[in-house]
Design a protein with these regions (language model features):
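Short, surface-exposed glycine/acidic/tryptophan-bearing loops
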Residues: 102-152, 169
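Short, exposed beta-strand-loop hairpins at the edges of beta-sheets
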Residues: 166-170, 180-184
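N-terminal targeting leaders of exported, membrane, and organelle-targeted proteins
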Residues: 1-107, 182-197
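Envelope-exposed proteins and targeting segments
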Residues: 142, 175-177, 189-191
Length: 197
């Protein structure tokens, strides 16, 4: 029998920070991907990773709200490098880091933590396209990946195990990315990847 259930963010952090726990977490994640293939969205909230499909209007109530957040530049850098490593290893071109897209991604990650939701849509119904247009950025194509995870590495691993998120990361339609990582302390980390041409 396999079961998955929500884990409080402070417990996730404690497990990730321990030497034994972090090793177990990596192995546990290896079991999650096959379970998600069998059970679909039922297993989208677990010890290691929470996400929703890149083109869905699904909304998840996080069960908390916090203003005690800070930009996690180190995680943004790690994730940016991991994204480009995946692209280049498959013969693709590296994405350029775009500061305007990064600011939009940071704002969305912060908004989700402050207002306790997890979605590509703000509570007012605004999408990544709306947010980018509102910032005066021109684009032909736009995409977004979201993850709530204890680390950039686990978030990126989760993206690469999800066909829709992986497609965004590897798409030749995009040449720019902005990554916004917000650290909510005991509440964990929120990641937004905003892709554009």
């Amino acid at each position: 029998m396999v079961a998955t259930f929500p884990i409080q963010p402070n417990i996730k952090n404690e497990v990730l920070d321990s030497k034994l726990g972090s090793r177990i977490l990596k192995y546990a994640y290896g079991f999650e991907a096959p379970v998600k293939q069998v059970f679909g969205g039922i297993a989208n909230d677990s010890l290691t990773f929470l996400t929703i499909g890149p083109k869905t209007d699904e909304k998840v109530n996080l069960g908390f709200q916090t203003d005690k957040i800070s930009v996690d530049e180190a995680s943004e850098t790690v994730m940016f490098n991991l994204v480009n490593k995946e692209r280049v290893s498959r013969g693709g071109k590296a994405l350029v880091l775009d500061n305007k897209l990064r600011d939009i991604a940071r704002e969305h990650s912060a908004d989700m933590m402050k207002r306790g939701y997890f979605s590509h849509y703000s509570p007012e119904g605004k999408t990544v396209a709306d947010r980018v247009m509102g910032a005066g950025i021109d684009f032909l194509v736009i995409g977004e990946n979201l993850a709530y995870a204890p680390s950039a590495e686990l978030a990126q691993q989760g993206f690469m195990n999800s066909p829709g998120h992986k497609a965004n990361i590897l798409s030749t339609d995009y040449n720019k990315v902005g990554i916004g990582a917000m650290d909510g302390g005991v509440y964990g980390k929120m990641f937004t990847q905003a892709f554009s041409n």
